Swiss-Prot record:
Protein family membership: Belongs to the orbivirus NS3 family.
UniProt protein name: Non-structural protein NS3
Lineage: superkingdom: Viruses
Functional note: May play a role in the release of virions from infected cells.
Coiled coil regions, renumbered to chain: none
A Pfam family it matches: Orbi_NS3
InterPro entries, A to Z: Orbi_NS3 (IPR002565)
Amino acid sequence: MNLAAIAENYSMHNGESGAIVPYVPPPYNFASAPTFSQRTSQMESVSLGILNQAMSSTTGASGALKDEKAAFGAMAEALRDPEPIRQIKKQVGIRTLKNLKMELATMRRKKSALKIMIFISGCVTLATSMVGGLSIVDDQILDDYKKNDWLMKTIHGLNLLCTTVLLAAGKISDKIQEEISRTKRDIAKRESYVSAASMSWNGDTEMLLQGTKYGES
C-alpha cells in the first residue's frame, strides 16, 4: 500500500476530509460579569479612596468643610453597606430628611426672633446707659432725677432688665446656632448617603440612576 492510500484511509476514519491531522479548535475564554466578591472588593476600594480623600483634604475648620467631610463619610458608608441594608437606609433617610429640614426652618425662625430681641434690648440698654451717664455730668439732669424718683427707678430697672435679656438671648442664640450646624451636617450626611445609594456600580464607573428630591414625599 502506498502513502496516498494510507493517508486517504486515515482521513476517512477520523472524519476529516483532506487533512491528515485532525483539526482541534482552540479554547475560547468568554467574558463574564464580575462576581459578587469582586464587586464587594471594588466597592470597598472605592470606599477607602473616598475616606482617604476626606482625610487628605483641608483641616475642616469651617462649617462647610466639616459638612464636606461628613458627606464623604456617608458616601463611604453607603459603598460599604450590603445592598439590602443600603436600600433600607435610603428609604429611611428620605423620610427623615423632610423632618430635619422642617426642624431647621423652625430653628432659623427662632434665631431670627432672638436677633430682633437682642437688637431691641441693646438699643434700650444703650439709651438708659446714656441717660444715666448724662445725669453724672449734668447737674440739672441729676436734680430732675432726684425730684422724680420713679423715673430714676424706671430707667435703672429697664437697664437691668434689658441687659439680662441681652445676655440670655445671646447664649440661647449661640446654642440654637450649634443646633443649626448639627442639623445641617445631618442633612448633608443623609443626602450624600441617599445619592450614593441611588448609584449603580459596574466595577469601573458610577452612574446616577435617578434624581432624588430629598425631603419631598
